[in-house]
């Protein structure tokens, strides 16, 4: 009984290897020179043509100036963000990054919320979004 199972298992493994290695990948099937030439010409026609243009010094300087303007405008835009007035802090509140277990009062920061981990054993006030 054990010999027949061993023989069947060996036969099954041999058949698996035979079927896996008997089929070559598609790129290995084409070994003929004619098929390689026709295949390569088809591949070259599939891709769009590329044109190479030489840049002179003026165009490089203009692009640098434009890049610097974009950088400065982005910095100015980030600086122009108006800070909204904070709400007055109520006395019973929890500061950011302090413990805020459920019987504790709410977080002081209006953008913060109480996040609990490890089955509500470790809770702390955290700011979730920076754009709040």
Swiss-Prot record:
InterPro entries, sorted: Agouti (IPR007733), Agouti_dom (IPR027300), Agouti_dom_sf (IPR036836)
Region feature Disordered, mapped onto this chain: 61-87
Record flagged with keyword Signal: yes
Keyword Signal annotated: yes
Cysteine disulfide partners in this protein: 93-108, 100-114, 107-125, 111-132, 116-123
PROSITE patterns cross-referenced by the UniProt entry: AGOUTI_1, AGOUTI_2
UniProt GO cellular component terms: extracellular space
Residues the record marks as carrying a glycan: 39
Record's keyword terms, sorted: Disulfide bond, Glycoprotein, Knottin, Secreted, Signal
Domain (Agouti): residue spans on this chain: 93-132
Residues spanning the signal sequence: 1-22
Subcellular location, record wording: Secreted
Pfam families per record: Agouti
Primary location: secreted
Biased composition regions of type Basic and acidic residues, renumbered to the chain: 63-79
Function as written in the Swiss-Prot or TrEMBL entry: Involved in the regulation of melanogenesis. The binding of ASP to MC1R precludes alpha-MSH initiated signaling and thus blocks production of cAMP, leading to a down-regulation of eumelanogenesis (brown/black pigment) and thus increasing synthesis of pheomelanin (yellow/red pigment).
Domain-level remarks: The presence of a 'disulfide through disulfide knot' structurally defines this protein as a knottin.
Name of this chain's protein: Agouti-signaling protein
Organism the protein comes from: Macaca nemestrina (Pig-tailed macaque)
């Amino acid at each position: 009984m054990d010999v027949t199972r061993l023989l069947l298992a060996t036969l099954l493994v041999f058949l698996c290897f035979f079927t896996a290695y008997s089929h070559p990948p598609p790129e290995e099937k084409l070994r003929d020179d004619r098929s390689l030439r026709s295949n390569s010409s088809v591949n070259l026609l599939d891709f769009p043509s590329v044109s190479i243009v030489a840049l002179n010094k003026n165009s490089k300087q203009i692009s640098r100036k434009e890049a610097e303007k974009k950088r400065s405008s982005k910095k100015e835009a980030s600086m122009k963000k108006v800070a909204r007035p904070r709400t007055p802090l109520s006395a019973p509140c929890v500061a950011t990054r302090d413990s805020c277990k459920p019987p504790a009062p709410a977080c002081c920061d209006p953008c913060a919320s109480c996040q609990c981990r490890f089955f509500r054993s470790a809770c702390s006030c955290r700011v979730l979004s920076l754009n709040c």
